[in-house]
């Protein structure tokens, strides 16, 4: 997917930040997530990311840790590769499972062990800081002014674009990830929504508290 033609089109369209969903450079994990055949081996992805340095103002590598079958050595190898790539920004989220995706994740990856999460996170911080600075709990940037697309500085925010999430007037909404459907709805003068939820006062307080923890 990271072809030269597509990347140049993005750059020429004034896109200045590219976030690449890597998850892990471990081939075993990539195969279990059904990403190896789609996007290539960890070595291929790492090489492509290294070639992307300088094409955009910000190159973000989006990673996940605490996979059920992941051990500390596997995580350290991911960190070794990231250190070599020298991306401007790295996001490292723990594997998060919702009730809707739990069965699928367990079937593909196994049962999640929360006992490793703290130890793995400490290793990530130890390796990335001080070369990187905290932008949020999960986001590490070489420059303090860089953004994390999942973190906002305002009580309310509008999500524009395919797959974006917004929160306005106590309503949280998500736009469709399907780009053709998004374009079709916009052309029809309709909101390209995939899901909405109206928060109660209690929900609003809890949501605001959670957002401020970041």
What are these regions (language model features)?
Residues 1-214:
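C-terminal scaffold of the Radical SAM
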């Amino acid at each position: 997917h990271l072809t030269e033609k597509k990347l140049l089109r993005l750059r020429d369209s004034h896109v200045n930040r590219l976030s690449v969903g890597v998850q892990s450079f471990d081939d075993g994990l990539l195969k279990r997530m059904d990403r190896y055949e789609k996007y290539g081996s960890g070595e291929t992805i790492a090489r492509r990311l290294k070639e992307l340095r300088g094409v955009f103002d910000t190159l973000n590598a989006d990673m996940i840790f605490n996979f059920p079958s992941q051990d500390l050595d596997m995580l350290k190898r991911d960190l070794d590769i990231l250190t070599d790539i020298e991306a401007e920004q790295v996001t490292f989220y723990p594997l998060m499972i919702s009730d809707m995706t739990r069965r699928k994740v367990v079937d593909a990856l196994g049962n999640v062990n929360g006992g490793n999460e703290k130890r793995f996170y400490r290793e990530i911080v130890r390796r990335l800081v001080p070369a990187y600075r905290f932008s949020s709990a999960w986001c590490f940037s070489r420059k303090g002014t860089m953004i994390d697309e999942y973190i906002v500085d305002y009580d309310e925010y509008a999500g524009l674009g395919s797959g974006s999430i917004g929160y306005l007037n106590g309503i949280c909404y998500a736009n469709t990830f399907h780009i053709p459907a998004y374009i079709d709805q916009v052309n029809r003068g309709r909101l390209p929504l995939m899901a909405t939820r109206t928060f109660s006062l209690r929900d609003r307080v809890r949501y605001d508290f959670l957002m401020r923890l970041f």
